[in-house]
Amino acid sequence: MYKGIVTPMITPMGQNGEIDYRATEILIDNLADFGVDGLFPMGSTGLFPMFSTDEKKKFLGFVRDHSKKIEVYAGVGSSSTQESVELSKYTEDIGIKVRVLMPTYYIKPDEDWMYRHFSTVISAASNDLFIYNIPQLSGSWISESLIEKLTREFSNVKGIKDSSGDMRFFSRIIRHKNEKFDIFQGQDDLLFLSLSIGASGGVCGLSNISPYITNLYHEFSAGNLEKARKIQIDEVNPLMYAINEATFPAGYYYAFYKMNGIKGGYRAPMVEPTTDQKKKIDQELTKIPKKQ
């Protein structure tokens, strides 16, 4: 059973746009201090479409090697089934327990196409797999019927990350949660609400930057619902809204670099936030307690 807070990791970069592995170590150290339960490299926040297969493999391996025993949820998404299969086999070869797979993107698949993609990739390796529903970026919804079909046919399909932001859809799929299938919320501002109706946890971008998300989860798990609610309203939401003033996911990169004194970079076509956007983010960053 999977639960808790999983961080959809940024992929720290130098000013030349290449992956900065020293900054990645700093990120993982921070995440360990925050108390996250999982590391999700090469997801949407990690800008996986911008990296070659070799770059993805190297980064996944690095995170695995430096994970500090935190569970790694490896992103294997691609518009190519062949690449997703290759990445899946690689994650199994290096001992990563969990993969995360979204639909193919750019060319919009129908349900049969989507089933073929998922079933082929799921079958390519024996390690566990999480379905990733993010229609606003992939262009395709993963239907409730397809979720049911995949979980029925493949025993290694262990959960879903739903980043649709549609609580009606989330409320429908939550009924599929059981001891063998977990459901995670992918939108930070919906975490408290989702936990309240039975979510297993959250895959939350703000956990790259601050302990707000893990604090919320721990207070909720301890039964301190009013404390958890106040963290959602007073801490999580203002920071999320400030960061999302910038084009996704540039605000998360800027905030991480700023909080850690790193002169980081942005791989084209991503650009850094504007001066006004930075000011709004900076105002919220000053509220985050400093590490002791």
Swiss-Prot record:
It is found in: Cytoplasm. Keywords: Cytoplasm, Lyase, Schiff base. Its EC number is 4.-.-.-. PROSITE patterns: DHDPS_2 (PS00666). Belongs to the DapA family. Homotetramer. This is Uncharacterized DapA-like lyase Ta1157. It comes from Thermoplasma acidophilum (strain ATCC 25905 / DSM 1728 / JCM 9062 / NBRC 15155 / AMRC-C165).
